[in-house]
């Protein structure tokens, strides 16, 4: 359904979950509010955040909640092409503009006309391309490579980067005037370590997706200790890394319904296990037994989740265990860790 909000048409028949934006944590609730607010206007948006945090999903969500929802959404990775190819892709070219240009070709700005264009990794764009993009934003028109006439375009521009563009401006690598053009509105996507209470929800979502993709008749589940192991890791690759790990787990435990902690440790590549060990110095101690390690991991995960949720009951719900059982397990772990110290 399309409705009017403050004079701007927006799409209300839409859920962030439809795009895989999953989470009930405070950072994700704040992100959802930002997406809704940003969708109500047509200003340019700069989405920042670490790699793997879902910046393109946020861009798609803004588009899907906007009045342009039924119109094109065009995405391009600005860091994946050299200057010549990027310019041709964005602005199009005339026949004979360069060797191999046997016929004229519309660019992505024209393809996105009346809709939205998403410029991913805009921080990788060369200074020469930045100048041409700035002109498009100023004039609302593109000039194809090899052409003389300008073609008007009505496009909402959303850009994203994992770079600190402020530092890039200071280093002379990014134009300040372009920055102010693309960053009228800004959204920062939270890292996974900033919203660890969302990990169980994401894990269940990715398990369902992987089972469907692999046509597995079973629905995989992860036991409590396994979920704890996934929760305490800091996930430097964020949601993208978590999704890949879950897909690997489903593929390597295809015949089993329950994924145990041992299965997780056996399925993960040695490089990731080593990385996890170095990132968990508080709980990973030399000469620890597996039980000692799991006890420390449970306590760390419990404290992290309880701090984020503010409630023992909500923490138990996230870990898919009743509150009394969780309390008993936490207390037993505390006693064992105390005796081992």
Feature-to-residue mapping (PLM):
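Conserved post-Walker A coupling segment in P-loop NTPases
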Residues: 20, 27, 33-99, 110-126, ...
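Nucleotide-binding/hydrolysis machinery
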Residues: 1-7, 12-18, 24-29, 36, ...
């Amino acid at each position: 359904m399309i409705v009017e909000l403050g004079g701007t048409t927006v799409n209300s028949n839409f859920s962030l979950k439809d795009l895989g934006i999953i989470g009930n944590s405070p950072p994700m609730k704040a992100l959802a509010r930002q997406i809704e607010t940003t969708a109500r206007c047509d200003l340019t948006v700069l989405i920042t955040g670490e790699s793997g945090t879902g910046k393109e999903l946020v861009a798609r969500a803004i588009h899907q909640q906007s009045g342009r929802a039924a119109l094109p959404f065009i995405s391009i990775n600005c860091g994946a092409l050299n200057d010549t190819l990027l310019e041709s892709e964005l602005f199009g070219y005339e026949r004979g503009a360069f060797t191999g240009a046997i016929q004229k070709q519309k660019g992505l700005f024209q393809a996105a006309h009346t809709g939205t264009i998403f410029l991913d990794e805009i921080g990788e764009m060369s200074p020469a391309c930045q100048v041409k993009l700035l002109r498009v934003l100023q004039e609302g028109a593109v000039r194809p490579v090899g052409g003389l006439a300008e073609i008007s375009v009505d496009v909402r521009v959303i850009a994203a980067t994992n770079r600190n563009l402020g530092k890039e401006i200071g280093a002379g690598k990014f134009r300040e005037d372009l920055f102010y053009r693309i960053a009228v509105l800004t959204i920062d996507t939270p890292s996974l370590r900033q919203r660890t209470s969302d990990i169980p929800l994401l894990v269940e979502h990715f398990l369902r997706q992987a089972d469907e993709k692999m046509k597995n008749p079973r629905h995989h589940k992860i036991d409590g200790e396994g979920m704890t192991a996934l929760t305490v890791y800091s996930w430097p690759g964020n949601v993208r890394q978590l999704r890949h790990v879950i897909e690997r787990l489903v593929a390597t435990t295809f015949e089993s319904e329950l994924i145990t902690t041992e299965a997780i440790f056996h399925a993960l590549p040695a490089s990731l296990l080593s990385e996890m060990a170095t990132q968990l110095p508080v709980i990973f101690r030399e000469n620890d037994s597996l039980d000692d390690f799991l006890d420390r991991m449970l306590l760390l995960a419990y404290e992290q989740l309880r701090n984020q949720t503010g409630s023992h009951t909500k923490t138990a719900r996230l870990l898919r265990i009743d509150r009394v059982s969780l309390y008993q397990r936490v207390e037993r772990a505390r006693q064992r860790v105390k005796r081992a110290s």
